[in-house]
Curated annotation (Swiss-Prot):
Disulfide bonds: none annotated. Zn(2+) binds at H75, H232, D236. Belongs to the LpxC family. Pathway: Glycolipid biosynthesis; lipid IV(A) biosynthesis; lipid IV(A) from (3R)-3-hydroxytetradecanoyl-[acyl-carrier-protein] and UDP-N-acetyl-alpha-D-glucosamine: step 2/6. Catalyzes the hydrolysis of UDP-3-O-myristoyl-N-acetylglucosamine to form UDP-3-O-myristoylglucosamine and acetate, the committed step in lipid A biosynthesis. Keywords: Hydrolase, Lipid A biosynthesis, Lipid biosynthesis, Lipid metabolism, Metal-binding, Zinc. It comes from the Bacteria. Coiled coil: none annotated. This is UDP-3-O-acyl-N-acetylglucosamine deacetylase.
């Protein structure tokens, strides 16, 4: 099984969730073993997608350094992971990725337009060898060894609309596109004013965010799935784990997880060299793992 990049360059435009300004995005092919690289054209600054370059996880996953930052990368990263893309350059002319419709389906469409190209180098994956867990009170995220990678996610909100939701996701590109990619980000009406006073969520609207009041959803079209909230958290988690640089072959379990806990989990994994093995998918090894790329 070979590493993948894009077959051609594709461009798009969307609104930034936090600043509310139009953002141009370009996805470009990269050579083998390059990984996922973000480039801010307005700063002439590159940022490799990796846990060590994460500087903030409060409202989104943010890459950066003293030169600047790129926020809200997780939806795009999630789509890139689902499509099995190993090497891609993401060019942005602003400090965040566009929110599109609040899900990752627009990025999936961009990747469909670009197509994929095989590179003459074996694909590598990260196989989890022992359990790694991060907790914050009763909240936790965990990776464990498995023969059938899944994501088991539970959320619990003190809100009548959301309440407690669980979803078990078995990884495949087809399953992702059908059941995860269209799940939108969500927020609470009571938080909007506070966020905007901090110059955040300025681009948020009913066109790119599910807005929840105490006992109703404000979006006139309603939900795309009855459990769209937990499905979106899975979308986010896939994007956050992609920062490890490989498709992760392990069971991910979360209760009330977050970008912050996901980031701490990726750091814990990389700290313990016995916790994982990087497996090159040569002809002799790919059979055991190829299902996850179906």
């Amino acid at each position: 099984m070979k590493q993948l990049t894009l077959a051609k360059t594709v461009k798009g435009v969307g609104i930034g969730l936090h600043k509310g300004e139009p953002i141009e995005i370009t996805l470009e092919p990269l050579e083998a073993n390059s990984g996922i690289v973000f480039f801010r054209s307005d700063l002439n600054a590159s940022y490799k997608a990796s846990p060590e370059n994460v500087i903030n996880t409060q409202m989104a996953t943010v890459l950066g350094d003293e030169r600047g930052f790129i926020s809200t990368i997780e939806h795009l990263m999630s789509a890139i992971n689902a499509y099995g893309i190993d090497n891609v350059r993401i060019v942005l002319n602003a400090n965040e990725a566009p929110v599109m419709d609040g899900s990752s389906i627009s990025f999936c469409m961009m990747l469909d337009e670009a197509g994929v190209k095989e590179l003459d180098v074996p694909k590598k994956i990260m196989v989890i060898k022992k359990p790694i867990e991060v907790r914050d009170g009763n909240k936790f995220v965990r990776l464990t060894p498995t023969k059938e990678p899944r994501i088991n996610y539970t959320i619990k909100f003190d809100n009548a609309v959301i309440g407690e939701q669980s979803y078990n996701f078995e990884f495949s590109k087809k399953n992702y596109i059908e059941n995860i990619a269209r799940a939108r980000t969500f927020g609470f009406l009571k938080d909007v004013q506070a966020l905007r006073s901090m110059n955040l969520a300025l681009g948020g609207s009913l066109e790119n965010t599910i807005v929840v009041d105490e006992n109703r959803i404000l979006n006139p079209e309603g939900l795309r799935f009855k459990d769209e909230f937990v499905r979106h958290k899975i979308l986010d988690a896939i994007g956050d784990l992609t920062l490890l640089g490989y498709r992760v072959f392990g069971d991910y379990t979360s209760y009330a997880g977050s970008h912050h806990l996901n980031h701490l989990l990726t750091k814990e994994v990389l700290k313990d060299k016995d916790a994982y093995e990087i497996v090159s998918l040569e002809k002799t090894t790919q059979k055991a793992y190829e299902k996850v790329f179906a």
